[in-house]
């Protein structure tokens, strides 16, 4: 909600500055879909074919809500045997859409929206299966050296720039390495300062994800206006947005998310 509100305010600011031309009716229609948290049909050019024009990352939350609804409604989706049948199908769909679109970055626009559905279907229900194994007492552990080696291999994947290697790397990340890292991390035990740090990072992570795009757009508009278009380097912009998104996420968690959750819990 907060991310979409910030995105809507940015659109209003651009209209008032004369940088965008949007009729009040168009804004109301898009706002309705944003408030209802439904994908907005690609009715207007200014939405850039985005299902959630005010806050692009909201597409994944939409699919997560759909997946949670399916999980709550159909008991068979919680059975390991059903998941072991469903996940290969989801993996095939994810592979198909990734190869078709030429990228793993799917879901944030309508051209790749079905790929986003496949992406969330595999990742979400892989998480359900991992949790089921964990709940039943299965534990996976790696020696520290092997764990660091695994993280190093994952990080080095960003060096692949050729399309063929990058595609194979993205698919291996989606289908194997990321679920493996989640399974291993779920069995890790931490205490003291590392545990507190993990808690803080966990509290901030979702806010950073949902707020970084509106902040990126705002900073892009501001720096272009002050210094000229594309005069700020990508690294500088990344650092600025990272710092601001972290601060915004901390404020949102403390002043918005926690009080709202407490109120809803008491009333519901």
What is the predicted role of each segment?
Residues 42-48, 73-82, 102-255, 259-268:
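Alpha-helical transmembrane segments in multi-pass integral membrane proteins
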Residues 4, 90-95, 128, 217:
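Residue-level recognition of pore/gate-forming positions within transmembrane alpha-helices
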Residues 60, 83-84:
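Alpha-helical transmembrane segments and their helix-entry boundary regions
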Residues 3-65, 96-97, 172-186:
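Membrane-interface helix-loop-helix regions
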Residues 24-34, 87-103, 116, 124:
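A short, conserved beta-to-alpha structural element at the edge of catalytic cores
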Residues 2-3, 75:
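Alpha-helical transmembrane segments of multi-pass membrane proteins
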Residues 12, 87-88, 264:
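Short hydrophobic/aromatic-enriched beta-strand-loop microsegments
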